[in-house]
């Protein structure tokens, strides 16, 4: 069996702590640089962030049955726009530097792993990142625009106009983005639970119908609409994730 590197076994607790400190400082430095760059490029950053609020967004062009709609956004407090600018620059920088962060963290723990563990961990880290980013992209292109269009134009009475704040828009964007990113980690979670012996392929197949009901409920919560087409668009990717999870669980 392959053993961990000898140099790692000779390191003291304080050596490990110093190495971890170096990794954290590098991550913080890159995060700060990413934040400053994102903050300085305000116009392209918010052009990207606000694109789903425009009737010309790519999804609305694909699905012509949506028709035209217009949602005006407002800022209601003196500091709101500046604070939102900082917040979105911070979150954007976190997403951008994620590969480098994972690379540094893996470099820190890999010397303590056996060679076969190192290969397995590399695959898990890479696929976790790919799935998380896939969830983010799907949310930006499909899930969030559908939710925004429905909630932004929904009225209990024609006499009550919607006044959408920039803060509520960005909060929903962040929430759904994080939710979809985590949701797309389902295959990784299933693989891990399978390794622990908690679930297996037969278990997931047996409860497939129950899972479909749960998936429909989750999709309905994410996009609260009575439109069957929209519900299907949201449900299908999540269901495919479940089927993918079945295929990788032994």
Give the role of each language-model region.
Residues 1-250:
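Membrane topogenic/interface segments and analogous intrinsically disordered interaction regions
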């Amino acid at each position: 069996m392959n053993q961990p590197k000898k140099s790692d076994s000779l390191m003291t607790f304080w050596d490990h702590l110093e190495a971890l400190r170096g990794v954290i400082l590098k991550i913080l430095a890159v995060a700060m640089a990413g934040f400053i760059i994102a903050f300085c490029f305000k116009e392209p950053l918010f052009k990207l962030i606000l694109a789903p609020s425009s009737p010309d967004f790519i999804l609305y062009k694909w699905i012509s049955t949506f028709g035209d709609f217009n949602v005006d956004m407002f800022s209601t407090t003196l500091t709101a726009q500046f604070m939102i600018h900082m917040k979105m620059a911070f979150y954007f920088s976190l997403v951008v530097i994620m590969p480098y962060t994972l690379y540094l963290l893996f470099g820190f723990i890999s010397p303590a792993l056996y060679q076969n563990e190192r290969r397995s961990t590399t695959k898990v880290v890479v696929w976790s990142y790919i799935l998380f980013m896939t969830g983010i992209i799907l949310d930006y292109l499909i899930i969030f625009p559908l939710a925004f269009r429905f909630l932004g134009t929904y009225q209990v009475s024609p006499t009550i106009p919607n006044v959408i704040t920039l803060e509520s828009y960005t909060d929903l964007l962040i929430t759904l983005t994080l939710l979809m990113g985590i949701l797309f980690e389902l295959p990784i979670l299933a693989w891990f639970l399978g390794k622990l012996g908690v679930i297996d392929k037969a278990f997931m197949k047996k409860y497939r119908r129950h899972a479909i009901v749960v998936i429909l409920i989750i999709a309905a919560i994410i996009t609260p609409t009575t439109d069957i087409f929209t519900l299907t668009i949201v449900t299908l990717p999540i269901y495919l994730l479940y089927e993918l999870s079945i295929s990788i669980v032994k």
